[in-house]
Amino acid sequence: MRASIWGTGSYLPKKVLTNADLEKMVETSDEWISTRTGIKERRIASAEEFSSFMGAKAAEKAIEAAKISKSQIDCIVFATAAPDYIFPSSAALAQAYLGIKEVPAFDCLVACTGFLYGLSIAKAYVEAGMYQCVLVIAADKLSSFVNYEDRNTCVLFGDGGSACVVGPSRPGSLKISKVNLGADGKQGDLLRLPAGGSRCPASQDTIQNQQHFITMEGKEVFKHAVRRMEFAAKTCITEAGLQEEDIDWLVPHQANERIIDAIAKRFAVEDSRVFKTLAKYGNTAASSVGIALDELLRTHDIHSKERLLLVAFGGGLSWGAVILQQM
């Protein structure tokens, strides 16, 4: 039995934060942001739009697209870098919001690679026969952890949610053909949220030192991102018994246009076949690839046997690649 994606969904908050808005907040410009990142605007969640809420909203659309009832879902995996709480899990909160029966529900914290890790978990469960219908959710309200006085990070991130339903392959679904994942904790300090966990719990000092905001070593992250995603993608292609020219669409993590372009060049993918949502939504962390995949499927006809290559990179450091094929 092979696992496949039955349906996808996404959710974006209504509030738009443009580059022009950021010009009024920090020392930056639309030209500076656009040329360095490719981002024009991003969505910012309201006080009521937390990660579990956005994920649940995306899940409703995925369930509808999959043409199933909520009662068929027998496991929930929630990928996030910005959970509502350390506990209870955002998966359990989304489960309650959706009114889904008391099935296993847990979080997966792999930052921006989360959607791919979630797909991998769902694939393994379905193909092992452990569960028949797994709901994978990825959502992040990263604006809660962005320092809007730091122009190097505040221009990058936006909020959003994505989801998909994974089950045994059926006609019209997207078969999850091959997965390759990796992580390197030795490089963890390059991209992290320093305080708030058990190693560095919240205190007056951590607040005064602004340690509850995202920190990033941009140049080092860029180098690792391109190299690691290229490795994961090429390994995936080789293990699937394919050639690079067999890939019809590239759906990358929407982090930075320079990173996306660097990956596309390494695979000689035509620009029209590299799907981007970056300019509209910025980097939406774990939900990024899922949002892009959902938008691609809703705006383009993916023909039978076409293959999609998903690639992502995030904190951990973590990375991954997944090959999907239209059934």
Swiss-Prot record:
GO biological process: fatty acid biosynthetic process; secondary metabolite biosynthetic process
Oligomeric and partner information: Homodimer.
Classification via CDD domains: KAS_III (cd00830)
Renumbered residue ranges of the record's region ACP-binding: 254-258
MF annotations from Gene Ontology: 3-oxoacyl-[acyl-carrier-protein] synthase activity; beta-ketoacyl-acyl-carrier-protein synthase III activity
Top enzyme category: transferase
Catalysed reactions, as listed in the record: malonyl-[ACP] + acetyl-CoA + H(+) = 3-oxobutanoyl-[ACP] + CO2 + CoA
Protein family (similarity comment): Belongs to the thiolase-like superfamily. FabH family.
Top-rank taxon, per record: Bacteria
Record protein name field: Beta-ketoacyl-[acyl-carrier-protein] synthase III
Organism the protein comes from: Chlamydia muridarum (strain MoPn / Nigg)
Keyword Endoplasmic reticulum: no
UniProt keywords, alphabetically: Acyltransferase, Cytoplasm, Fatty acid biosynthesis, Fatty acid metabolism, Lipid biosynthesis, Lipid metabolism, Multifunctional enzyme, Transferase
Cellular component, GO annotation: cytoplasm
Biological pathway: Lipid metabolism; fatty acid biosynthesis
Major site of localization recorded for this protein: cytoplasm
Subcellular location: Cytoplasm
Active-site positions on this chain: 112, 253, 283
Enzyme Commission number: 2.3.1.180
InterPro entries (alphabetical): ACP_syn_III_C (IPR013747), ACP_syn_III_N (IPR013751), FabH (IPR004655), Thiolase-like (IPR016039)
Notes concerning its domains: The last Arg residue of the ACP-binding site is essential for the weak association between ACP/AcpP and FabH.
Role played: Catalyzes the condensation reaction of fatty acid synthesis by the addition to an acyl acceptor of two carbons from malonyl-ACP. Catalyzes the first condensation reaction which initiates fatty acid synthesis and may therefore play a role in governing the total rate of fatty acid production. Possesses both acetoacetyl-ACP synthase and acetyl transacylase activities. Its substrate specificity determines the biosynthesis of branched-chain and/or straight-chain of fatty acids.
